[in-house]
């Protein structure tokens, strides 16, 4: 069942006009992106506009390339690709073989913020490579083409200090016949790989995605610090995330309609899973599809407190062909190190009752606090 999120009344408010504040991401990321003193502010009406603005920011006044970029950027995106999204929705199985579309931010370390206006939409991805201090907010990504070409909605490679906040990412949790290796029709919502750490994923609405996100692309790509908070995952298959090593702090998320597996903690990683709401979920906390080097988890104050709650919330489990560990006893298997940032989680019940008013696009970047839970 699709989880319906209400829209803000001021549907066309330009969020970039709001006052800027120092970053408080509620997680490992500490970046303001490009929204700092001396930033150049630009408006983009298309994917190509964003590409052109970023390329220009790599050059000095004499047209010479500046390592890491010449100046920080704030890009307000007001394009609308609803027509492309609707066409893709009408031809789900035709998207996998199309060319991937995306903005590549490569070797840019001065800082970039990309923020969508309310009502904007994108049928293209944003791919980060060897950059840092990137913020992506209020962007609506739908039905990415080019699954055969790794056409992710957001890809973070060799890029530390990233904040992905208040976005919507959606496709169809569906398998089309004939895709390579039985792979999914669409690629990932948010993949985080290689030397990418100190990343915060917050207040996103992610639905209809089969492979939601990686933390590490192989068994040797481990050791990052990631926070996932106040996200809604609805009708998703797996990888929430698929964690290879490192530390993940997942708090105040709503997981509903998980069709295969949820938080999959592998390669000796550890996850702090705190004050989340789980319902209608298969294998919501597990270590599988690997066969060795299991991860561990610490469970704190989620709506599910013991196996006695599984039937109430429709939590189910299955086996894997390789050795695996499920949280079927709903007990912690590890102890998370101290969290190095300040955060104020609400109760799991408040997540269930109120998060839909805050997660996703067109919410004017509003956040859920304890005062909103009454």
Curated annotation (Swiss-Prot):
Keyword Signal carried by entry: yes
Q: Binding residues for Ca(2+), per the UniProt record?
A: 150, 152, 187, 191
Q: Where is the active site?
A: 239
Q: Which GO terms describe its molecular function?
A: metal ion binding; pectate lyase activity
**Cofactor binding notes:** Binds 1 Ca(2+) ion per subunit.
Task: Tell me where the signal peptide lies.
Answer: 1-22
Which Gene3D superfamilies does this entry report, sorted A to Z?
Answer: Single-stranded right-handed beta-helix, Pectin lyase-like
Going by the record, the broad EC class of this enzyme is lyase
Q: Does the keyword rRNA processing apply?
A: no
Provide the alphabetized UniProt keywords: Calcium, Disulfide bond, Lyase, Metal-binding, Secreted, Signal
* EC numbers: 4.2.2.2
Task: Name the cofactor(s).
Answer: Ca(2+)
Record-linked InterPro entries? Pec_lyase, Pectin_lyas_fold, Pectin_lyase_fold/virulence, PEL
Any one GO biological process: pectin catabolic process
What reaction gets catalysed by this protein?
Eliminative cleavage of (1->4)-alpha-D-galacturonan to give oligosaccharides with 4-deoxy-alpha-D-galact-4-enuronosyl groups at their non-reducing ends
Q: Where in the cell is it found?
A: Secreted
Q: What is the protein's known function?
A: Involved in maceration and soft-rotting of plant tissue.
Regarding protein family, the annotation reads: Belongs to the polysaccharide lyase 1 family. PLADES subfamily.
Kindly provide the name given to this protein in its UniProt entry: Pectate lyase 3
């Amino acid at each position: 069942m699709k989880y319906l999120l209400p829209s803000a009344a001021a549907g066309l408010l330009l969020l970039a006009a709001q006052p800027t504040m120092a970053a408080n991401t509620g997680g490992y990321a500490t970046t303001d992106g490009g929204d700092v003193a001396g930033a150049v502010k630009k408006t983009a009406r298309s994917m190509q506009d964003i590409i052109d603005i970023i390329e220009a920011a790599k050059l000095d006044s004499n047209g010479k390339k500046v390592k890491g970029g010449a100046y920080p950027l704030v890009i307000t995106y007001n394009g609308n690709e609803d027509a492309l999204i609707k066409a893709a929705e009408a031809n789900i199985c035709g998207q996998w073989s199309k060319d991937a579309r995306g903005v590549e931010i490569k070797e840019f370390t001065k800082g970039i913020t990309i923020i969508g206006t309310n009502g904007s939409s994108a049928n293209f991805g944003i791919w980060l490579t060897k950059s840092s201090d990137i913020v992506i907010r209020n962007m609506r990504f739908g039905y990415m083409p080019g699954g055969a070409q790794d056409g992710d909605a957001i890809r973070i490679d060799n890029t530390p200090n990233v904040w992905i906040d208040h976005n919507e990412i959606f496709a169809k949790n569906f398998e089309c016949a004939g895709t390579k290796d039985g792979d999914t029709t669409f690629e990932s919502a948010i993949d985080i790989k290689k030397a990418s750490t100190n990343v915060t994923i917050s207040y996103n609405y992610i639905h209809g995605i089969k492979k939601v996100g990686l933390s590490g692309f192989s068994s040797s790509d481990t050791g990052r610090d990631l926070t996932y908070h106040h996200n809604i995952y609805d009708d998703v298959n797996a990888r929430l995330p698929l964690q290879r090593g490192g530390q993940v702090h997942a708090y105040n998320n709503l997981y509903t309609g998980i069709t295969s597996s949820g938080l999959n903690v592998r390669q000796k990683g550890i996850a702090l899973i705190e004050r989340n709401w789980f319902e209608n979920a298969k294998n919501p906390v597990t270590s599988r599809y690997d066969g060795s080097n299991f991860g561990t988890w610490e469970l704190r104050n989620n709506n599910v407190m013991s196996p006695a709650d599984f039937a109430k919330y429709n939590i189910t489990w299955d086996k894997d062909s390789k050795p695996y560990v499920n949280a079927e006893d709903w007990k912690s298997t590890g102890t998370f190190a101290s969290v190095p940032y300040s955060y104020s989680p609400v109760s799991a019940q408040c997540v269930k009752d109120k998060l839909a008013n805050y997660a996703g696009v067109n919410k004017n970047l509003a956040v859920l606090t304890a005062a909103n839970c009454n």
